[in-house]
Amino acid sequence: MSKILYRLSKILFLFLMAVVLILILFFQGMPYVCKKEFFLPNIVIATYILLVVGIAFLVCRLWMRSGHMLGKSAISDRVFDRAAACIALCLLAVDIYISYNILFINRWDPGATWEIALFRVNRDWGLPEWTNIYISRYPNNLLLLLLDTACLKLNGAVGVFTGDYAVMSTIILDCITISGACFLVYKVLTLHVKRKYAFGGFLAVVVLCGLSPWMTICYSDSLGILFPVLTYYLYTKPAGNTRRKWASQIFAVIICCIGYFIKPQCAIMLIAIVMTEFFNFCKERKLYQMARPFLLVALACVCLSVTSSVVTKQYESIGVELNPETKFGMTHFLMMGLNEADGGMYSQEDVDYSISFETSKERTAANIEKSIQRLRDMGFLGYMRHLSRKLLTTYHDGTFAWGMEGSFYTRVMDDVNTWMAPFLKSIFYSDGSRHEILKTIEQIVWVGVLLFAFAAGFVRQTEENQADLNILTLSIVGLTLFQMLFEVRARYLFLYVPVYCILATLGFENLWTGIQRKSGVKRKEKEKKHENAKTESNFVDRYPLL
């Protein structure tokens, strides 16, 4: 039973990744929302990547056939570890400097949460009337508001940033989580592959996340990037004894539940862990294996309940009254995800429709009814076409739709210096003269990550790595299905980019070592045949009459 479940999980991952690759390589001409044009088509990028890797494999094989062996890396593990730590620290400083130079204010959700946080800190201003409505409608932003408020209070006490630049206090937190997530990718990979491969995966996530313009917007998409990879690391890392292992895994569940209140998609990693534990129970059928999934779910429920209660009381203490009847539930986002006219993205028409119902029960029933009606109107083929467009919106863009949605550059700050600020703005602003260079580099790395992440589905599973690998692949399956079902955004993928980079590194390492192993076996067989022939020749020369 366990083998069947693991195999089905692997097949589902390979199927979804194959569909994604086919769409972004061969159907990028389809119309879909937030479509961004790149200097090179994805199929050209993929061809170049495979060509370079193929040439490298060929050179390696020829080198080994000529009697040489690929020696071990001259760089020690300690050097790789120190280099990764230093780069992560430097990345934090660079991100803060870049953010300070290209700072701007936007008017969509990050701007709204920031404005409410300002009113909370400056209580003499009085909270605006729309605060209760916004927080009640989108309660998932409650913890984010608390973090923004805490950063503002700390900045007010220290006095580092003033005026409009006070928002830098929250952006610094954003930069910390991004650089921390990048370093965790390296730490996770060192548990599975050699340091040289781990360092390569680390550099990939630095390009895609560490140097992404999303670092300048302190919102749940970038702030939540730390939680899935940290949850995975804490849950799977080796421990000295059973007690430490349990403590680490309990802490992983707590971290994931906190991440849920930053970005609900963080919970997908915990769901993948629980499902994998159930797979293990089906394999061993032991009592403690059966108890683990239920204990994890129970612990998660307690953590979610406690965190929700604490956060809610924080707001009630300042006079904010949360109205559960105005909350937008999952059925609202399911309805938006089925809106073919808006490509499954945000729809003001759907928001107005949900607002028109006074109670949560009425709203849920109406959302479900409209969702069913939209499915009937699209039909099977229409729904498949709709899902294809949603997957293109999700996966096609290596910048994750930077500058493509909402009111982005509502207010741009004046240049803080004469040269560096204009130069950085020309790179990171979507309308900058040098932005094409950045987005092309990120697109090349992203296409490569998707290609090798697909190859991770062919990694040979052993007793040691089967469960760990299954958690990674199941989390990607869950995230992809989430995007297909509910409201779609390319930036929703951003917080799982570290997981994609981990899978891509595992896939590349599997391909590379496979070629080495195959070439090495053939070379040894050839040497053995040559040695046997030489022995027979010497025997005949020594005993000619025989």
Please place each PLM-identified region on the residue numbering.
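Start-transfer (signal-anchor) and selected internal transmembrane alpha helices
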Residues: 1-96, 291-300, 518-519, 525, ...
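Membrane-proximal stem/loop segments at transmembrane-domain junctions that anchor or position
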Residues: 126-128, 313-418
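Membrane-interface anchor segments at the N-terminal boundary of transmembrane helices
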Residues: 21, 36-49, 167-169, 173-174, ...
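Short hydrophobic/aromatic helix or loop-helix immediately within or flanking a transmembrane segment
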Residues: 133-163
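Transmembrane-helix signature of polytopic, membrane-embedded enzymes
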Residues: 185-207, 466-470
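Extracytosolic helix-loop segments that constitute the early lumenal/periplasmic catalytic or substrate-binding loops
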Residues: 111-137, 143, 342-348
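Short acidic/glycine- and proline-prone juxtamembrane loop motifs at membrane-interface regions
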Residues: 210-224, 262
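Transmembrane-helix motifs of polytopic, lipid-linked glycan transferases
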Residues: 169-192, 230, 451-458
